[in-house]
């Protein structure tokens, strides 16, 4: 994948005392898993070793490169989602600890790295909720549509379609449903503005 990096190469260059850099890497991982799950893909071996990273604006975009254990379904059950998240948490923790040991970092750092791996699940759940929420608001609060779209764009998602539907028992209340595209909003926007690929 042109312009991408393996996580080990990135990790070896990141200052160990600045977790914000690792957080960007792990946010990309959470975004990738959300994308796969939205499309009915159970990864089965979500790990940093099976992932490449590229830049998308200020975000790191993650790409699946090892799909031997993946399965494609029309949609995933809560059990499948939870199982894939558990696999990811364990594999990411191991994937962070291994290069830390190679760099000779103190063993006390393992706890921090494990906590960072566990935080990927929180990021995943936040993204999942943002994509699947169907907020209800008053007819006069239509500005919230723009706020919802802007929030999804900030998370890196292009919004393909917005549907407003009255809540059945109160026509002054609207439910917003948003259909989002892939998580490449920033890269697409740069291409539109510059004409560069």
Q: What are the roles of these predicted feature ranges?
A:
Residues 1-26, 62:
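Conserved structural core of kinase catalytic domains
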Residues 20-23, 75, 79, 111:
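Short, solvent-exposed segments of well-ordered alpha helices
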Residues 98-197:
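Regulatory N- and C-terminal appendages and interdomain linkers associated
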Residues 14-44, 48:
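Conserved kinase catalytic-core helix
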Residues 3, 81-84, 88, 116, ...:
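Alpha-helical structural motif
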Residues 17-18, 71, 99-103:
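Short, polar/flexible loop-turn hinges at active-site or ligand-entry regions and domain interfaces
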Residues 33-40, 92, 96, 124:
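Hydrophobic, Leu/Ile/Phe/Ala-enriched alpha-helical segments that form helix-helix packing faces
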Residues 42, 48-98:
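Catalytic activation segment of kinase domains across protein kinase-like and atypical kinase folds
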């Amino acid at each position: 994948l042109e312009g991408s990096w393996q996580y080990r190469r990135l990790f070896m260059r990141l200052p160990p005392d600045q977790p914000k850099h690792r957080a960007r890497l792990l946010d990309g991982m959470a975004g990738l898993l959300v994308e796969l799950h939205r499309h009915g893909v159970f990864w089965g071996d979500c790990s940093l070793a099976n992932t490449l990273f590229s830049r998308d604006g200020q975000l790191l975009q993650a790409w699946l490169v090892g799909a031997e254990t993946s399965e494609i379904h029309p949609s995933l059950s809560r059990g499948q989602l939870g199982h894939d998240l558990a696999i990811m948490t364990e594999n990411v923790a191991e994937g962070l600890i291994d290069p830390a040991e190679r760099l000779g970092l103190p063993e006390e750092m393992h706890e921090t790295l494990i906590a960072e791996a566990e935080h990927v699940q929180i990021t995943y759940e936040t993204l999942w909720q943002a994509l699947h929420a169907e907020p209800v608001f008053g007819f006069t609060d239509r500005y919230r549509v723009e706020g919802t779209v802007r929030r999804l764009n900030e998370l890196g998602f292009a919004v393909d379609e917005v549907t407003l539907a009255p809540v059945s028992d109160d026509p002054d209340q609207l439910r917003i449903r948003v259909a989002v595209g892939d998580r490449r909003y920033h890269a697409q926007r740069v291409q539109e503005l510059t004409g560069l690929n």
